[in-house]
């Protein structure tokens, strides 16, 4: 199922297309234009709340809310932080400015509301995984024709929904705000630059982001806090040496000999083909970038197909590094020594590697055994163990290496899905043997 990347030299991590095939098929068949983004694992699709289908736009713009005199409406659930900024999302499906909101997210800085983000359209959650389940008895040509027919119909539906949503939101913002809107942008790099339109209502900036027929999002924050950078203002104000100290301070060394970055939060990919994007998002948020997988999909030129085919992922890694005032080394293999140098400085390493469900179970088992017994070591791989490792025919998948154990020759890594609260473990030899492409972040 591997499909060529835009560059002839690299292929996209495609295990993402198979991991949750059943969930993906259900999503394709049942989720509507207001399908739920992957960050909450589909929870909102079933969330029961008195705010469902209820207009809350006025409450989100209330000056008393931003002055700290009122609480946000509804029940909020925690999500991955960005630097020192805490993140949460509303456990409801309300309306905002007369339109159904796919997701409402909040950011709090030192206990005070810092910004809101309302997503109105997102192709990644609308298309989900490509549904390949077809009626029996079709010839290969008929199968291809049926898939194309289904996809074309879904693309037409989304295009119409996207166009109507954008037009309605622009009209509402124009009527709602007092001043003439201004063109602006977010991002220092050309790859991640987002063109936005800034509207103003009182002391609030209403920043409209429309991304290439994939994403419609409204950002709300005080006028005096808007920025043209993805990097959090606390981080962008730091010197290079101060930033280095922040990252180095995240490295822990428990008694079992691990060297570990302890504060990299998981951003679950849900039913989207986004393992390469979500692992990068996890690193980006750790660096203090206000990025998510949905904008990265726009910047990476993902198509509205329910697949990662044709996207341009590798260039996003360098852009993320540049936005975070870091450097990047891309390699066709995995070097434990080079990974150690990055991790020692508090910088994670993203690895595209060959994936096997059998080996994934083995990694989980090894991880749990090590958690129960601090003296446990993964055995040195013999010929039989090496023969069980996935080869070049196996699907690709992206993981984030966040630690290592030098005396045990083990690496610790996290995935873009839930299920284990501690980093997984494997022998460094296996990571090196199965790695396809490695991204080392550097100071």
Q: Which role does the model predict for each range below?
A:
Residues 33-37, 42-44, 48-78, 82, ...:
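Active-site-adjacent structural segments surrounding the nucleophilic cysteine of cysteine proteases
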Residues 270-274, 282, 301-307, 334-336, ...:
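Solvent-exposed loop/turn segments at secondary-structure junctions
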Residues 1-13:
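N-terminal secretory signal peptides that target proteins for export/translocation
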Residues 219-224, 228-230, 239-256, 374-443:
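Noncatalytic regulatory segments and standalone regulatory/sensor domains
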Residues 111-113, 270, 346, 394-398, ...:
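Extracytoplasmic
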Residues 308-404:
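Predominantly the structural core of cysteine protease catalytic domains
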Residues 36-128, 146-235:
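A cross-family detector of function-defining hotspots
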């Amino acid at each position: 199922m591997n499909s060529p990347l835009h560059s002839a030299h690299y292929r996209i991590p495609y295990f993402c297309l198979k991991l949750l095939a059943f969930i993906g098929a259900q999503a394709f068949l049942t989720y509507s234009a207001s399908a739920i983004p992957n960050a909450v694992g589909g929870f909102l699709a079933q969330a029961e709340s008195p705010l469902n289908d209820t207009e809350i736009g006025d409450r989100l713009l209330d000056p008393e809310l931003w002055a700290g005199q009122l609480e946000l409406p509804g029940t909020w659930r925690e999500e991955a932080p960005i630097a020192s900024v805490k993140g949460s999302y509303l456990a409801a499906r309300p309306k905002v400015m007369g339109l159904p909101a796919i997701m409402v997210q909040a950011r709090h800085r030192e206990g005070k509301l810092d910004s809101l983000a309302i997503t109105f359209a997102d192709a990644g959650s609308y298309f989900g995984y490509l549904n390949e389940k077809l009626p029996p008895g079709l010839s290969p040509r008929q199968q291809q024709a049926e898939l194309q027919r289904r996809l074309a119909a879904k693309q037409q539906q989304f295009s119409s929904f996207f166009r109507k949503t954008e037009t309605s939101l622009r009209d509402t913002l124009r009527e709602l705000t007092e001043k003439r809107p201004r063109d602006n942008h977010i991002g220092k790099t050309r790859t991640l630059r987002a063109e936005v339109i800034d509207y103003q209502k009182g002391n609030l900036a209403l920043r409209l982001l429309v991304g290439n027929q994939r994403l419609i999002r409204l950002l709300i924050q005080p006028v005096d806090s808007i920025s043209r950078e993805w990097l959090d203002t606390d981080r962008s104000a730091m010197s290079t040496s101060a930033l280095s100290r922040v990252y180095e301070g995240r490295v822990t060394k428990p008694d079992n000999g691990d060297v570990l970055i302890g504060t990299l939060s998981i951003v679950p990919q849900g039913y989207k083909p986004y393992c390469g994007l979500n692992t990068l998002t996890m690193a980006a948020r750790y660096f203090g970038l206000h990025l998510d997988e949905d904008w990265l999909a726009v910047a990476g030129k993902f198509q509205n197909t329910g697949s990662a085919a044709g996207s341009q992922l590798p260039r996003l890694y360098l852009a993320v590094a540049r936005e975070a005032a870091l450097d990047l080394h891309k390699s066709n293999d995995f070097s434990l020594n080079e990974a150690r140098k990055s991790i020692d400085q508090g910088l994670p390493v993203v690895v595209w590697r060959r994936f096997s469900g059998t080996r994934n179970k083995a990694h989980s088992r090894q991880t749990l055994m090590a958690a129960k017994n601090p003296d446990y070591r993964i055995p040195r791989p013999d010929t039989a163990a090496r023969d069980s490792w996935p080869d070049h025919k196996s699907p690709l998948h992206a993981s984030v290496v966040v630690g290592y154990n030098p005396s045990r020759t083990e690496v610790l890594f996290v995935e873009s899905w839930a299920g284990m609260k501690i980093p997984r473990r494997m022998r460094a030899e296996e990571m090196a043997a199965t790695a396809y492409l490695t991204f080392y972040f550097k100071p």
